[in-house]
Amino acid sequence: MRWCWIDRFTELVSGQTASAIKVVSMADEHLHDHFPAIPVMPNSLILEGMAQTSGLLISEYNDFRERVILAKVTKVTFHDRAVPGDTLTYRAKLEAIEPDGARATTTSHIGNRLQAEAEILFAHIDRETADRPLFHANDFGLLLRGLKIFDVGRKADGSKIQCPPHLLEN
């Protein structure tokens, strides 16, 4: 992912749910361009953070071997804006997974307050070119470790999720 709109995962249960956070800071350059003189996190970037949380939950289900991309946002509602000092908590729930894609519901909260909610469809893309990854395996593995997925991630039985060997390659 060239642009990562989450700071770290706080929970992941394989094939079920995930939670991640994004701290909104005055240091974020994109806040100053969206509405001049009113620093606010653009809703499109909040939606992208929600999608990244959901997409990585879906990708983990198959040991990060599927090429998962956002296909369609079927519903999204924003209830409030996010401003510097807010911590967004993204919560994703895997609703369905099929060979060609998946569906997830996701929310964004500021504290206990619902900030946004969405239903998102994802696609597993072109199996014919699966030999060409979206990301270099080692770089993607480093990103996932930086997001703390393997620190907090658990299988449904409670055992710890391990970084797959194919993401440790040089």
Listing of model-derived features with the role each one plays in the protein:
Residues 6, 70-73, 117:
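Hydrophobic residues on conserved beta-strands that form the core of alpha/beta folds
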Residues 54-89, 123-125:
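Hydrophobic beta-strand-centered segment that forms part of the acyl-chain substrate-binding groove
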